Amino acid sequence: MNLYVKSISKSIKGEKVLDDISYTFESGKIYGIYGKNGSGKTMLLRAIAGFINTDKGYIKYNHKALHKDMDVLPDLGAVIENISFWSMYSGFENLKMLSNIKGIVSDEEIYEIMIYFGLDPKSKKKVNKYSL
């Protein structure tokens, strides 16, 4: 299942923010988007996430068009620009709340991934006390 971005363009207040962008994102791969400040990175991600409509072009996932066959991409999780957690909760509590959105991640999986990244899932330390 690939994600196809085909010839999308977007203007805001007469200024072209996205200009004829096309790309195929292959399933199972990780991508990064980089560019200068104001180059349209966030706008592109917002378009892919279905948060905005584009002026031209289309976005398709699994041969279904965004905003035509579906409102948002299925199973999409996106944090665009500001990453934040609930500072008054522990790391495990934060991840547990996020996992409850779809209900597809078990407590055991949260424990395993926290241990993998060197975090103690049983710690009561609040995330605002974590070092970055």
PLM features: residue spans?
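Conserved ABC ATPase signature
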Residues: 125-132
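Conserved ABC transporter NBD signature motif
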Residues: 57-72
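The feature captures the beta-strand-to-loop junction immediately N-terminal to the Walker
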Residues: 34-36
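Conserved ABC ATPase "signature" region
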Residues: 107-123
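Pre-Walker A (P-loop) beta-loop-beta motif of ABC nucleotide-binding domains
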Residues: 21-32
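Conserved structural motif at the start of ABC-family nucleotide-binding domains
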Residues: 3-5, 18-20
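Helix-to-loop junction immediately C-terminal to a conserved catalytic motif
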Residues: 49
